[in-house]
Regions:
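Short, compositionally biased low-complexity segments enriched in polar/charged residues
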Residues: 95-117
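Terminal interaction module
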Residues: 1-93, 101, 109, 130-292
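Glycine-rich, often proline-containing surface loops adjacent to acidic residues and nearby aromatics
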Residues: 114-126
Length: 292
């Protein structure tokens, strides 16, 4: 008799993928995201995720509803990328001119599950003791691989979702000495009016990235809430960029807070075979009102 699956918690990171047109401000459709993702998988495109490490999609399956792709899912791998160069032999203590790694074989592979939701343009991957790779490494892979699969008039921007606690830590500081924000704009995401104001302004100006640096007056904290631009940009940094602040904490110590130190990690509870569906449902609840 087959052993029943046990329900447990599964954790995952979230990356925000935005496919853009170079020549206009049009938001590309979910099917465009599917097209680009499929091409990366079909052509076995592998790209660097960190020094000497590459990633590649192993499998990619579709889940459809009403003739639309709800999500893509499968597994991807990170491996050590070795190029045949000069090898040193520890036995002979000399260069081995004959040795070559068999073509197409790479060591130290780690494999995990992923889910990509085109309507929310979010890429999620399961993290575990066996696959605890930084989402910033996965972002590097996705940006390079997806860029290769784009049409000539398209480009890709990828951001790691940060936790709201990172912004709250900045805003609750006793004193904000300096604030640096680097953002782009979202693709039909839900958000506050301030966030929408800043992002629509960036979009209207044909700007791909927007950077702002705010420095305090002597001995006076930056008041973020009194600035429409700073408030909106800081909220945008959660999903569409990064922020960094130099603050004075309650113990009068100078600290540096970066949103990149607080990647958003979500979890679902259920059996492993339902991981993809549960992630899809949660992402749609978070980033799309009523799944629209």
């Amino acid at each position: 008799m087959a052993k029943a699956e046990r329900s447990k918690y599964f954790n995952f990171y979230i990356l925000n993928i935005k496919l853009r047109k170079r020549t206009n401000q049009k938001n590309l459709a979910p099917e465009d995201y599917v097209r680009v993702m499929r091409k990366v998988h079909r052509e076995k495109i592998h790209e660097e995720s960190s020094p000497n490490k590459h990633c590649i999609f192993r499998f990619m399956f579709e889940e459809k509803a009403k003739n639309e792709v709800e999500y893509l899912s499968g597994t991807f791998a990170q491996f050590t990328f070795i190029q045949n160069e000069r090898w040193f032999n520890l036995k002979s203590l000399d260069m081995d001119e004959e040795f070559k790694v068999p073509e197409g074989l790479f060591p130290d592979a780690k494999i995990t599950d992923y889910v990509f939701i085109p309507k929310a343009h979010r890429f999620c991957y399961r993290t575990s003791a066996d696959f605890n790779i930084s989402p910033y490494a996965i972002r590097k892979f996705l940006e390079k691989a997806l860029d290769k699969a784009c049409r000539p008039d398209e480009f890709v921007q990828v951001d790691v979702e940060s936790s709201k606690e990172s912004i709250e830590a900045i805003l609750s500081a006793r004193e904000i000495k300096k604030l640096m924000i680097d953002i782009n704009y979202s693709n039909v995401d839900i958000g506050s009016d301030l966030k929408k104001f800043v992002e629509e302004d960036i979009k209207a100006s044909n700007t791909s990235r927007f950077q702002v640096v705010a420095t305090q007056k002597p001995d006076v904290s930056i008041d973020v809430e009194q600035s429409t631009i700073l408030s909106g940009a800081l909220q945008s940094a959660i999903s569409d960029g990064e922020a960094e602040a130099v603050i004075i904490d309650e113990n009068n110590r100078t600290k540096r807070i970066k949103t990149s130190q607080f990647p958003r990690k979500e979890s679902i509870y259920g059996v492993k075979s339902r991981f993809n569906q549960l992630v899809f449902e949660k992402i749609m609840r978070i980033f799309r009102n009523n799944g629209n």
